[in-house]
């Protein structure tokens, strides 16, 4: 955990907390343990972009939001990859999207196999097929 000082606007200094912030509880602990002014979330958001919403809610209310469902997680992964492909083109976009997909499947049944499968995604259709298989496997269909 790090609480470093960086120069802000004018003569204002903001102490930033960074490291191992993955949810609201760890963000709150960072504030309390370091006395920082703000918390940065890095790898804790990989494959979990909703973590920012969850942390904000926890810090404001002290309540944890329910876990994101597998359907929601796959919908976000799909949209994320579609947006990458929209801006980069499908060929380059899917090359870049592979690493993101690997983060989204972390913790799912057979995640090691799924991460390897992510490395072979070449088209958006490949992604859709993988998502269908994940949902069928996770939901027992």
Regions found by a protein language model. Name each.
Residues 1-13:
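Single conserved hydrophobic/aromatic residue that forms the stacking wall/gate
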Residues 11, 15-17, 21-141:
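Alpha/beta catalytic cores of nucleotide-metabolism and tRNA/nucleoside-modifying enzymes
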């Amino acid at each position: 955990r790090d609480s470093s000082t960086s120069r802000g606007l004018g003569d204002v200094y903001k102490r930033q907390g960074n490291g191992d912030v993955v949810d609201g509880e760890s963000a709150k602990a960072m504030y309390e343990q370091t006395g920082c002014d703000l918390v940065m979330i890095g790898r804790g958001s990989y494959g979990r972009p909703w973590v920012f919403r969850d942390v904000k809610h926890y810090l404001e209310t002290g309540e944890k939001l329910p876990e994101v469902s597998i359907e929601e997680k796959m919908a976000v992964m799909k949209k994320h990859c579609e947006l990458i492909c929209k801006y980069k083109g499908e060929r380059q976009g899917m090359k870049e999207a592979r690493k993101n997909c690997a983060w989204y499947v972390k913790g799912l049944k057979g995640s090691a196999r799924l991460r390897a499968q992510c490395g072979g995604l070449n088209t958006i259709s490949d992604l859709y097929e993988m998502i269908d298989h994940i949902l069928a496997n996770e939901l027992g269909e």
